[in-house]
Amino acid sequence: MAFTGTGQVSSSTGAFEQMAYFALRSNPLYEMIADVRSTAQTHNGASVTFDIYDNMAAATGALGEAVDVVPVALGDSTAVVTLVEYGNAVETTAKLRGTSFLNVDADAANIIGYNMVDSLDQVVAAVAAGGTNDILPTGRAATVNIIAGDTITADQTRTAAAKLRTASAPGFENGNYVGMIPPNVAFDLRSQTAVTDVIAFQIRQDGQAVRNGSIGTWGGVEFIENPRAHIQAGAGAAGIDVYDTVIAGRQALAKGFSRAPGFGEQPQIVYGPTTDYLRRFVSVGWYHLCGYSRFREACLQRVESSSSL
């Protein structure tokens, strides 16, 4: 008796899922703290300069009845944002588009769109972490002295909020500051169990934050766990990584961009022209002419720590 099985015919094949899956992604978050934008730009240029007037010293002395005041000169400072080009692109071939069971063009546009926000958010993260105000672990004089056991403490975050308030840094919603914290560091902050620490506070509330495994708003800071948070690779003692938690108020960062026709505040998706003779090659990419800079150093605090994970 002759059986007809998979070895006798070619109609038995492996199947493919026709929906494409993409690599895991995180949301772009740093752009939100670059809230200063040019609104009355004089002309198109390679940089955008923002002028900031200084406050006058308080006049607390009593005036003499017959003595005129002495005029005081005003002072100012500037923040300069240099515009640079950012972008990326992919190009597909006609043979791929004609033989793939997936919609390659649509998938390429999807991937390019995420690459755009991912890339720009990392640019902003590096600028935010480059501020001059840092809060080191107790007993450490510099980043290079941070050891593996120097995980973040509640005191460091409270110190950051206190310094921002001392500098009159304006807050975001409900007057709270925003803290971009690496997930590894957030784990360490939630692991502390003293009565003045995060987890003890949350347990005394309704416990929802504990169930969610999030910090939320605490100590005047709305913490957002961000995998793009800046890491100083190998910058600590014995080459350990140092993690930066950036705590910011409003006007911490500024964004500049070109206002010329065809440019703008937001990046753009660009479909390239088909220029080969047989029109086989199709490209899609993104482009942005912009720049980011720290606008008010007093509105930024960087908490440095190691991670136990």
Where are each of the predicted segments found?
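Extended amphipathic alpha-helical segments with heptad-repeat/coiled-coil character used for oligomerization
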Residues: 165-182, 187
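Short, surface-exposed beta-edge/turn micro-motifs
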Residues: 47, 174-178, 281
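Alpha-helical scaffold segments that mediate packing/assembly in large oligomeric complexes
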Residues: 99-169, 302-304, 308
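N-terminal "assembly arms/tails" that initiate or stabilize quaternary assembly
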Residues: 1-82, 300, 304
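Short, structured patches in soluble enzyme cores that scaffold and shape functional sites
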Residues: 94, 181-185, 193, 288
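Sequence/fold signature of self-assembling virion shell proteins
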Residues: 2-33, 147-158, 191-309
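Short acidic, glycine/tyrosine-flanked loop/strand segments centered on an H-E-D-like triad
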Residues: 73-100
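Short, solvent-exposed loop/turn elements at domain surfaces
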Residues: 57-61, 188-189, 232-233
